[in-house]
Amino acid sequence: MDLQTLKTICIENHIPIIRDKTLDLINHIIDDNGFTSILEVGTAYGYSAFAFSLNPHIKNITTIEKNTDNYSLACEYLKDIKKIHIVNLDVIFFKTNEKFDLIFIDGAKSHQEIMFEHCQKFLNNNGIIVVDNIFLKKFNNRKELTRNQKRLLSKVKEFETWLVSRQGWNVKIINIDDGVVICKKK
């Protein structure tokens, strides 16, 4: 399977995928820093892990997916890419002695703070954490939001405020696609 085929499958099945500008930004970060390893939170069907694996610097990707159905499909779609290791687990239970150059958080938006707190210990000293979809623009043009949508928007806004106020971190919010946050330890 090639990347375009997987992208088509994701779109046809309404599976969210990393947007092109965000992917380009992350590839620039990888290239500029010579990063070789990625921890991804939120595999879905594996589109972003597949895309990252095409970067020649990347030697190892561990991607975590909580949903068993998505995990099974990702295993099938990515089975030929040896540098990708897929884990079926809620990220808060993930443990490893391995450290990663880049951590890409694209999991449940209502649990971003918990995911960030848990995953930061897996980051190399000069590593970067990237959080995707900080703006949730899909809700911007809706006249009425459900109570759950309002709660989700509030949680994401709280996470953004929490993240920017973190001691010991340089945090940059980039207004591309649906918003990307770049976090690097000071």
State each model region's role.
Residues 1-102, 109-130, 134-186:
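A short alpha-helical cap/connector motif
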